[in-house]
Amino acid sequence: MQVITSVKEAKQIVKDWKSHQLSIGYVPTMGFLHDGHLSLVKHAKTQDKVIVSIFVNPMQFGPNEDFSSYPRDLERDIKMCQDNGVDMVFIPDATQMYLKNFSTYVDMNTITDKLCGAKRPGHFRGVCTVLTKFFNILNPDIVYMGQKDAQQCVVVRHMVDDLNFDLKIQICPIIREEDGLAKSSRNVYLSKEERKASLAISQSIFLAEKLVREGEKNTSKIIQAMKDILEKEKLIKIDYIELVDFNTMENIENITDNVLGAVAAFVGKTRLIDNFLVQGLK
């Protein structure tokens, strides 16, 4: 496995692979890897070569968010990648990604102003900009992203279509702890009491998905049922609960098809997200 920090060197390796007609699966991460990331690596191994990038992108964090405290453990991440058959770990620093006087950004006028985008201004501008750069540097065939960041997946798919990138976005299922909590690098922030309280998030998601699959169409009723679960936990502060069309991120009143149910909530000071996706409803 190659551990690369230079943009120039990464591009040269990719160029060599492509000259031998090798396909590339790419998993973008911010590090502090967990089983959710490793499941993406497993999917990516259907390609000839697998690249994992590790970059805590300052551009996608707001001024009062957790950029400086975001968990980091490069040595552990590199070992996990090696143990799971990754071919290249690309670990650029901010000076490699954003040169002096950097002034070019990728933004989107729709989809990004809802859900997490509404709560985190500028977040998706940072995501789209950095992924555009990674796509140009690494030239992947398929990019593997987790459904836990569902809005991000939809935003990036739209960006790929709009900008004619020659690649495919593959959305992979949420990976959960044994008790149901969605795997997240930020789970490490939780105290014992907060960890216990956080289960209300996944419980609200499971209930809502069950209601949808059983035929409930009224989103107000589903949202209220989710609120009832979350509001029982004093350590939880709801950021949003939304049921939206998965393709447009627009709120829906009556469920027809492709519904995404999404929750963001603070457990203590830690903001966690979770969701369910139901497609193919008649």
UniProtKB/Swiss-Prot annotation:
- GO CC terms of this entry: cytosol
One Pfam family per UniProt: Pantoate_ligase
Question: What Enzyme Commission number does this protein have?
Answer: 6.3.2.1
Which residues does the Swiss-Prot or TrEMBL record annotate as the active site?
A: H37
For the ligand (beta-alanine), the binding residues are Q60
Family matches, as InterPro entries = Pantoate_ligase, Pantoate_ligase_C, Rossmann-like_a/b/a_fold
Where's it found, cell-wise? Answer: Cytoplasm
Recorded GO molecular functions are: ATP binding; pantoate-beta-alanine ligase activity
Question: Which SUPFAM superfamilies does the record match to this protein?
Answer: Nucleotidylyl transferase (SSF52374)
Output the GO biological process annotations, alphabetical, semicolon-separated: pantothenate biosynthetic process
Keywords, alphabetical:
ATP-binding, Cytoplasm, Ligase, Nucleotide-binding, Pantothenate biosynthesis
Q: Give the residue spans that cross the bilayer.
A: none
The reaction(s) this protein catalyses: (R)-pantoate + beta-alanine + ATP = (R)-pantothenate + AMP + diphosphate + H(+)
Q: Which family does it belong to?
A: Belongs to the pantothenate synthetase family.
Assembly, in brief, is:
Homodimer.
Q: What else is known?
A: The reaction proceeds by a bi uni uni bi ping pong mechanism.
What is the designated name of this protein? Pantothenate synthetase
| UniProt organism field | Campylobacter jejuni subsp. jejuni serotype O:2 (strain ATCC 700819 / NCTC 11168)
User: Corresponding gene?
Assistant: panC
